[in-house]
């Protein structure tokens, strides 16, 4: 119906969302080709006038959406489908007082979002265009929300590290809001957008407040994610000993957002809600949980680790709920989300990886985060291996010192033994052979050997020494034979057989 309508330099391409008092469109800047989302917030006075004029009521969501589309279409048509609207200075919106915001309630959402949008995981407002029937808010565009990714795409089924990344980014954004005194009050998957790199962005501050304490008789947000103290029907009940209708004004607002985070964590890990409403009289499951929190382990496939964290988040008494910093730390340290399946083992994220690669890097891919986590584990393994190598080297050094001491002691014992005049040599098997002279001149063998049965281990490979000694033995034998023959010639006369033949 509104396709191709021009809003200043933005061309409307499609409607991507709707609410009680507004519509959301996908637009393209015709000058830069950049995509944006434009939220159209209708002024309550114009809506009441339109309903009264047509005799209609706004009870049906479909009826409301149709009426909003029709009214906006006629508005564009009256200007030939081209609107040129003035842009409101964003700084001037931040300067609006509380009284001025009360007179311009549709600007309260804009002012709160502008105040906190410096965080990297909160959707940013770029322009605010004003008309007589509606205010147009130009914001960042992301093509999917957390609800679609969880339920329709099953995007988190096998990715424990991705669950940590998205959940911690959401916690960080919400913690930033709380520190600046803004409480969202409508945390749910539909209000969390995701980019192509699976980074999360908090949006829709339409129900947010600056009040630190709950306003009496006020019930806001989706019943699936609302804390029990925020539900209107709890006003006549007691919550863990606290009578809500008597001290509703003293109950903190921020802990209600933390409760909603706990339900989202269950959505991410189990793809379901634990109950329809956190009300003991209207929801049987929640009533059983209020009596015994172990019911969570019976209805959900969660691990003991995750159960421990959830019991700290889903405290019925808002004053005893876990704080944001502790929650972020404990989720970072979880090693499992479920008892079985791919989420039964989840990498631990160190504070360095979390601060550097989750919060500060908006363009981080999941593969990069897995790589950082794997590098951390690899570094730990390398450190363990280096420590083992050092221990082995130290053991080897001690062993060498002991061997040297033993060798030195053995050498000293050998040096203390008397030296023998008998020549010796070594056989190929390492045993020592001793040679002794004899006085038998008639025996052609002048040397006899006796074998020492004990091998000399230090020279067991010295084969060449044995061969040299044998050669010397043969040479000495030949010389002795010659001397013997010469001696017989001198005593018995010449032997003709011995004389050379001339």
UniProtKB/Swiss-Prot annotation:
Its EC number is 2.7.11.1. May have a role in glucose regulation. This is Serine/threonine-protein kinase SKS1. It comes from the Eukaryota. InterPro entries: Atg1-like (IPR045269), Kinase-like_dom_sf (IPR011009), Prot_kinase_dom (IPR000719), Protein_kinase_ATP_BS (IPR017441), Ser/Thr_kinase_AS (IPR008271). GO terms for biological process: G2/M transition of mitotic cell cycle; positive regulation of transcription by RNA polymerase II; pseudohyphal growth; regulation of autophagy; regulation of D-glucose transmembrane transport. Residues 411-420 have a biased composition (Acidic residues). The active site is at 186 (proton acceptor). GO terms for molecular function: ATP binding; protein kinase activity; protein serine kinase activity; protein serine/threonine kinase activity. One of its GO terms (cellular component) is cytoplasm. Residues 376-439 are annotated as: Disordered. Residues 376-391, 399-410 have a biased composition (Low complexity). Residues 10-338 form the Protein kinase domain. It comes from Saccharomyces cerevisiae (strain ATCC 204508 / S288c). PANTHER family: NON-SPECIFIC SERINE_THREONINE PROTEIN KINASE, SERINE/THREONINE-PROTEIN KINASE UNC-51-RELATED. Belongs to the protein kinase superfamily. Ser/Thr protein kinase family.
């Amino acid at each position: 119906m509104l396709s191709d309508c021009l809003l200043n330099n933005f061309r409307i391409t499609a409607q991507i969302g709707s609410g009680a008092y507004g519509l959301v469109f996908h637009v393209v800047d015709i000058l830069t080709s950049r995509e944006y989302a434009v939220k159209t917030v209708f002024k309550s006075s114009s809506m009441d006038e339109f309903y009264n004029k047509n005799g209609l009521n706004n009870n049906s969501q479909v009826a409301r959406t149709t009426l909003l589309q029709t009214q906006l279409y006629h508005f564009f048509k009256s200007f030939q489908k081209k609107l040129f609207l003035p842009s409101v200075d964003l700084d001037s919106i931040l300067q609006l007082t509380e009284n001025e915001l009360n007179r311009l309630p549709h600007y309260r959402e804009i002012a709160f979002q502008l105040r906190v949008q410096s965080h990297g995981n909160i959707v940013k407002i770029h322009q605010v265009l004003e008309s007589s029937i509606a205010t147009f808010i130009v914001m960042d565009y992301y093509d999917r929300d957390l609800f679609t990714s969880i339920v329709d795409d099953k995007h988190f089924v096998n990715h424990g590290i991705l669950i940590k990344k998205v959940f911690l980014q959401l916690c960080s954004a919400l913690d930033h809001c709380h520190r600046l005194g803004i409480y969202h009050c409508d945390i749910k998957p539909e209000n969390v957008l995701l980019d192509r790199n699976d980074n999360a962005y908090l949006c829709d501050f339409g129900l947010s407040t600056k009040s630190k304490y709950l306003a009496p008789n006020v019930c806001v947000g989706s019943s699936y994610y609302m804390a029990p103290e925020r539900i209107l029907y709890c006003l006549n009940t007691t919550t863990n000993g606290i009578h809500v209708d008597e001290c509703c004004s003293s109950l903190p607002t921020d802990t209600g957002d933390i409760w909603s985070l706990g339900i989202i964590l269950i959505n991410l890990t189990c793809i379901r809600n634990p109950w329809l409403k956190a009300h003991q009289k209207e929801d049987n499951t929640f009533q059983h949980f209020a009596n015994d929190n172990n019911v969570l382990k019976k209805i959900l496939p969660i691990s003991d680790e995750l159960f421990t964290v959830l019991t700290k988040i889903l405290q019925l008494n808002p004053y005893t709920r876990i704080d944001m910093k502790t929650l972020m730390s404990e989720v970072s340290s979880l090693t499992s989300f479920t008892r079985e399946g791919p989420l039964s083992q989840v990498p631990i994220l160190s504070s360095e990886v979390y601060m550097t690669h989750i919060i500060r890097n908006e363009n981080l891919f999941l593969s990069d985060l897995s790589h950082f986590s794997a590098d951390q584990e690899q570094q730990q393994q390398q450190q363990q291996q280096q420590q083992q190598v050092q221990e082995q080297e130290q053991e080897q050094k001690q062993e060498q010192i002991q061997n040297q001491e033993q060798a030195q002691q053995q050498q000293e014992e050998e040096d203390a033994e008397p030296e023998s005049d008998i020549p010796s040599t070594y056989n190929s098997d390492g045993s020592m052979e001793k040679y002794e002279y004899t006085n038998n001149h008639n025996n052609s063998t002048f040397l006899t050997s006796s074998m020492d049965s004990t091998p000399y281990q230090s020279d067991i490979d010295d084969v060449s020494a044995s061969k040299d000694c044998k050669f010397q033995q043969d040479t000495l034998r030949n010389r002795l034979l010659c001397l013997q023959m010469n001696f017989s010639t001198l005593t018995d006369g010449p032997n003709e057989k011995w004389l050379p033949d001339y």
